Amino acid sequence: MYLRRAVSKTLALPRRAPPGPAPLGKDASLRRMSSRKFPGTSGSNMIYYLVVGVTVSAGGYYTYKALTSKQVRRTEHVAEPKEQTKAELQPLPGEKEEHVAEAEQVCSEPGDTAVTEAESVDAEEVPEAAVVLPEESQASAPSEVPAEAAVVEASLSSSEPELKITEASLVETTESVPESTQEVESAAPDQDDVCNEGADTSQEGADTSQEGADTSQEGADTTKEEADNSKEAEGTTTEDPRSISEESAELEESPPLGSEPPAQPESQEEETQVTEETASPQG
């Protein structure tokens, strides 16, 4: 009971006391004394904080807008000259078609003449090779393979220049499309030179095809000579057994001069003597 009363008294005293700051001593420092209260009232401090915050936020927003607007202006100034240069470089679609048609006409005229000449030369050479091939087949079958290979090589060599001419014309047309009219006019002599070079290459291909035909003819001649030699050899082999058999028959019919006559009577006399001797002991 005594302890209970003492505890209740000690706990009840702080509850009844007002919640005020602790009293400062005589030896308290200035920092502690100044930190106890803020300068001015609480309402004036809130207004100060609001004004400072609004000014800082407004300044930041203004600087952000100024920087973004400058960047947009710079990009617009840079994009405008780029679009102008692109519009100047890209010609109209009608002009492109005209340039392509002119380039094709310039390159097609000499190219077509060269191709027709090469085709005519090949058409003249192919019948000659066709005439030579049946004779070779009658002479010897293995000789057909090199002649056919030579004809195929000649046709391939004649077709290669045509492919080169078409590739050169295609490259020239693709290169001349994006150019302007002045550049096309300046490039016309160069295209003529290229077309002349294509005609020269086609002539060289025709020459190579002629050389291939000549080589095939030489091969046919050699095969003919071999066939003739083989026929002569077969003729000699077929004639030899017949001549040998005829000579042997003649030798059997007529013996050579100075040879001894056949010994048939002597053999008959010996047989008679043997029969007499065998008969005498029996008698």
Swiss-Prot record:
Disulfide bonds: none annotated. GO terms for cellular component: axon cytoplasm; mitochondrial inner membrane; mitochondrial outer membrane; mitochondrion. Residues 65-283 are mitochondrial intermembrane. Residues 128-160 have a biased composition (Low complexity). Residues 171-184, 199-220 have a biased composition (Polar residues). The gene is Mgarp. This is Protein MGARP. Residues 221-245 have a biased composition (Basic and acidic residues). Induction: Up-regulated by chorionic gonadotropin in ovary. Up-regulated by hypoxia in a HIF-1A-dependent manner in neurons and astrocytes. Up-regulated during gonad development after birth, probably under the regulation of hormones derived from the hypothalamic-pituitary-gonadal (HPG) axis. Its main location: mitochondrion. Disruption phenotype: Reduction of mitochondrial motion in the anterograde direction and increase of mitochondrial motion in the retrograde direction in response to hypoxia. The number of motile mitochondria is not altered. Neocortical neurons exhibit a remarkable increase of the dendritic number and the axon length. Neuronal cells show an increase in the percentage of round mitochondria and a decrease in the percentage of rod or tubular mitochondria. Residues 1-41 are cytoplasmic. It comes from the Eukaryota. Expressed in the ovary, testis, brain, adrenal glands and the compartments of the visual nervous system. Expressed in corneal endothelium (CE) (at protein level). Expressed in steroidogenic tissues with the highest level of expression observed in the adrenal gland. Weakly expressed in placenta. Weakly expressed in astrocytes and neurons under normoxia. Strongly expressed in astrocytes and neurons under hypoxia. It is found in: Mitochondrion; Mitochondrion outer membrane; Mitochondrion inner membrane. GO terms for biological process: anterograde axonal transport; axon development; axonal transport of mitochondrion; cellular response to gonadotropin-releasing hormone; cellular response to hypoxia; cellular response to steroid hormone stimulus; cerebral cortex development; negative regulation of dendrite development. It holds the Pfam family AIF-MLS.
